[in-house]
From Swiss-Prot:
This is Peptide chain release factor 3. It comes from Psychrobacter cryohalolentis (strain ATCC BAA-1226 / DSM 17306 / VKM B-2378 / K5). Residues 13-282 form the tr-type G domain. The gene is prfC. It is found in: Cytoplasm. GTP binds at residues 22-29, 90-94, 144-147.
Amino acid sequence: MSVDPKKLNKEVAKRRTFAIISHPDAGKTTMTEKLLLWGKAIQVVGEVKGRKTDRHATSDWMSMEQERGISITTSVMQFPYKEHMVNLLDTPGHADFSEDTYRTLTAVDSALMMVDGAKGVEERTIKLMEVCRMRDTPIISFVNKLDRQIREPLELLSEIEAVLKIKCIPVTWPIGMGQDFVGVYHLTENKTYFYEKGHGGDMTVAETREGYDYPDIRERLGALMFASFEESLELVQMALEDFDVDEFLAGEMTPVLFGTALGNFGVNMVLDTLIKYAPPPKAHPTNEREVAATETTFSGFVFKIQANMDPRHRDRIAFLRVCSGKYEKGMKLKHVRLGKDVRIADALTFLAGDREALEEAYPGDIIGLHNHGTISIGDSFTEGEELNFTGIPHFAPELFRRVILKDPLKSKALQKGLQQLSEEGATQVFMPQINNDLILGAVGVLQFEVVAHRLKEEYKVQCIFEPVSIATVRWIHCDDEVALAKFKRKAHDQLSLDGGGHLTYLAPSRVNLQLMQDRYPEVTFSNTREH
């Protein structure tokens, strides 16, 4: 399909595709909503409170998420902001969903890290940063909850640098906190932005003044606190000179902003920083070659499958990241893994569960393809070229359960449900070779609850999960057929096939795994598998 290269370059330059990473309860869902407010994508903010509130957050749209007030599914939201097009991928904040979150991070060009100002760097943030590290993802940081008592800002920066091994360069610096939160001083603009309570749900532009030394600020903070602010400001002003865009783009340095997502203060500064510094869509690796965003032929990969986004539709949607070229309604694409040509007449764009039919999409955009069971995570779509995008792995689960069906007559529905949920990446299924058991693997306990809930709600299947003595799993690979056959004979009782039919070893203990690895050096025991 002919694409005007000039128009394509312009559209690519406008795009910013990012995800928010944080520990649960650092304010990620609130931040998502406020970003949508600034992007004029929503008019009313539905703050997530308890399970009794009617107005749930726009980005939490599966019934279980709304009941529990946590984001389980990755949703996708697109909105315009100052001549740019922003694609925001909301990631599950709950500790159990690292696999889904990881796959989402393969589809973004930068990330916004949120830190709770009272708690500092938390465990989940550390894990997510490790994933960003693997991909050298540029990070913008936002220290949240300045309208409450937080830790000393300099102490927070030191902790981020020490724990996450990333250099911090403040863009804004807080003046006071909690009851005495005056606002922030913007270091590059030499302006103070004043915080006013009560504007959490609207887009009131903060009052600004040049500099920061004003009698009313001194009076509000008191002499001691103002002196402390000036002292810390001097230190961070020296750091600002070290800001290096290349180091930021390599994921080694992060611009830091302060504010309150709940109070909608500092959110537009995050968007401004994103547009100023974050990269437009980057090149993506494939097994065959690197694909640049500005290439005129279409290509993209599926990083997520979501079943039953709308119970009324009973469907499954494959989320595809556009890597190059332009999607146009009705275009013919090659589904590379199957070697089949398909006509895509009804791709979707999203505002968290609200679907709209899509006429066109550019690199960096996320589109939804209707999936009737033929699309898997990691699949590539092109205009004909044989390209297989890389870097979308399965991780070895750390928890295992045996599935026990309450009604044996429902076994067909159970298998269908588990197959679909595993294709979607909600769980991994293993079938031991010595019996007819179905073993589920997950990264965290909550995943089992989600699977049980969804099997019951969507497939009308009730099961119980019981513990099973499996410590970990490894994918098996061996080029030497004789050695592989010998290994299979010896390890028969521990072997299984995963949902994709790949041979796996279910280790009863870490010690056992180590013994098998020592005994069979020609066999590769891998803890990840590419989709």
